[in-house]
Amino acid sequence: MPTKTVRCLRLLPLASLLLAACSVNQPTQTGKSPTSPEWQKHQQKVQQLTQYQTRGAFAYISDSKRVSANFFWQDTPPQRYRLLLTNPLGSTELELRAQPDGVQITDNQGKRYVGKDAEYMIQQLTGMAIPLNNLRQWILGIPGDATEFTLDERYLLKTITYRQGNQNWDVSYQSYNTELTPPLPTSLELVQGEQRIKLKMNNWMVK
């Protein structure tokens, strides 16, 4: 199969299925304190995971589009992860593989694109700005680069507000699987302008 380097690519037909620096800034929060031992202990346990995978449902909603897909996310921190999107029939629509030496994306036609920046590639291929680097943390229920967030009564992440360039991302957590150790999200939503991305995690496997 031909391999192409991402430069300036047209919007893929299946693309819609995808999913001020200051060193003294401190996390802004309401509710339970992020300095509480409970939150610090939970965050430490999540960060100690050496591998995780989850599968579930993905939805993208905007003023002009409303689409859905099944997703599979496999992550081996700090630099390896795989995102697979499939249609209701189980066929692959898009696959992203990120490794220390680069990123490869394969579309539903089997065409491959390689590059260094997963977020940039997704934006070029789909026209959508998806905060993949932080989403790897958000999907686990930790704030990533965000310094503004709130905790619920169980000392679990409830909301995040994150500014990336000229975009503001608002993340909200609807539910967690508290039978897992550590507890992990089962439903979350990202909102940026007219974009709304919903993720529902049906199951988790962690190490």
Swiss-Prot record:
Compartments, record wording: Cell outer membrane
Main location per the UniProt record: membrane
GO biological process, one term: lipoprotein localization to outer membrane
Record-linked InterPro entries: LolA/LolB/LppX, OM_lipoprot_LolB
Signal peptide: 1-21
GO cellular component, one term: cell outer membrane
Membrane spanning residue stretches: none
Bilayer topology term: Lipid-anchor
Keywords: Cell outer membrane, Chaperone, Lipoprotein, Membrane, Palmitate, Protein transport, Signal, Transport
Domain of life: Bacteria
Lipidation (N-palmitoyl cysteine): 22
Residues carrying lipid (S-diacylglycerol cysteine): 22
Pfam entry (one): LolB
Oligomer status and interactors: Monomer.
Function: Plays a critical role in the incorporation of lipoproteins in the outer membrane after they are released by the LolA protein.
HAMAP family: LolB
Family from the record: Belongs to the LolB family.
Name of the protein described by the UniProt record: Outer-membrane lipoprotein LolB
